[in-house]
């Protein structure tokens, strides 16, 4: 999975897809009551990027619905995963449940259209900190209460704050999640980061019966050297400001026989076995 990073403007969707991304990540900004308002990262952000692009969240979902619906004039077959970077760290922790209800409702109304839409992308809920775990409970409660639990098949969760992997596992156990789990490891592209935690996450992914890391990806990689380093470790995905660079690296002799771009037929909730 090549994940285009911080794709918050509508015009950026095609831009990142044209560069080779098959997944996009966008930031969800909330008001103080936990209502998802806009796609927006804000300052500071990655070096060399404009931090202020934004779109009304519901408009973004309406647009991306077209882009991920087969037969639609805007359809782009390669876009198979949407990663929602939920900026829950900016709101009171007691509003995490309200935020989960709101995001689930907006996906139901504007992306899935309560069963009418044929939009097919998988959804990854990127949660910054384990303290915001009530978001997951609320999201699942909302789908159940509204009678749309079938969409759980399309949704996964991922904690992005580089917290202790055992703490993440405990929180997932608390909310009853033991499948559809990704694990991110990384840092803003302005800095370098070691590989100790990433290596541990990959080790757990490869442990039979471990259900709290089906896929592991590294972010936000901009240097060819760090892309190669992560691929050598065996990551499932790379998040980058430059998807075209990842595409280039994947074509190199060292990696061409080991990796390929994920397609819609690849289940993001299953561990890859060669």
Swiss-Prot record:
Tissue-specific expression: Expressed by the venom gland.
Main localization (coarse): secreted
Superkingdom, natural source: Eukaryota
Cofactor: how bound: Binds 1 Mg(2+) ion per subunit.
Entry keyword set: Cytolysis, Dermonecrotic toxin, Disulfide bond, Hemolysis, Lipid degradation, Lipid metabolism, Lyase, Magnesium, Metal-binding, Secreted, Toxin
UniProt-annotated catalytic positions: 5, 41 (nucleophile)
Cofactor(s) for this UniProt protein: Mg(2+)
An example molecular function term from Gene Ontology annotations: toxin activity
Gene3D superfamilies, sorted: Phosphatidylinositol (PI) phosphodiesterase
Task performed by this protein: Dermonecrotic toxins cleave the phosphodiester linkage between the phosphate and headgroup of certain phospholipids (sphingolipid and lysolipid substrates), forming an alcohol (often choline) and a cyclic phosphate. This toxin acts on sphingomyelin (SM). It may also act on ceramide phosphoethanolamine (CPE), lysophosphatidylcholine (LPC) and lysophosphatidylethanolamine (LPE), but not on lysophosphatidylserine (LPS), and lysophosphatidylglycerol (LPG). It acts by transphosphatidylation, releasing exclusively cyclic phosphate products as second products.
Protein's UniProt name: Dermonecrotic toxin SaSicTox-betaIIB1
């Amino acid at each position: 999975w090549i994940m285009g990073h911080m794709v918050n403007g509508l015009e950026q969707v095609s831009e990142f897809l044209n560069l080779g991304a098959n997944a996009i990540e966008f930031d969800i900004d909330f008001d103080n009551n936990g209502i998802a308002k806009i796609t927006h990262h804000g300052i500071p952000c990655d070096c060399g990027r404009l931090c202020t692009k934004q779109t009304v969240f519901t408009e973004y979902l309406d647009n991306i619905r077209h882009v991920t619906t087969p037969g639609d004039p805007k359809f782009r077959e390669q876009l198979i995963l949407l990663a929602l970077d939920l900026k829950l760290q900016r709101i009171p922790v007691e509003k995490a449940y309200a935020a989960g209800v709101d995001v689930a409702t907006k996906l139901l109304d504007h992306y899935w259209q309560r069963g009418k839409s044929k939009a097919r992308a998988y959804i990854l809920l990127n949660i910054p900190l384990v303290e915001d775990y009530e978001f997951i409970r609320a999201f699942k409660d909302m789908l159940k209460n509204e009678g749309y639990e079938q969409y759980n098949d399309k949704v996964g969760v991922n904690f992005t704050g580089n917290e202790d992997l055992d703490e993440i596992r405990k929180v997932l156990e608390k909310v009853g999640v033991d499948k559809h789990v990704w694990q991110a490891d990384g840092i803003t592209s302005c800095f370098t980061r070691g590989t100790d935690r990433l290596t541990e996450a990959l080790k757990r992914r490869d442990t039979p019966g471990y259900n709290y890391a089906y896929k592991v990806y590294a972010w936000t990689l901009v240097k060819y050297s760090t892309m190669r380093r992560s691929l050598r470790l065996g990551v499932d995905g790379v998040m980058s400001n430059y998807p075209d660079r990842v595409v280039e690296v994947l074509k190199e002799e060292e990696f061409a026989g080991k990796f390929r771009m994920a397609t819609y037929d690849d289940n993001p909730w299953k561990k890859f076995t060669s």
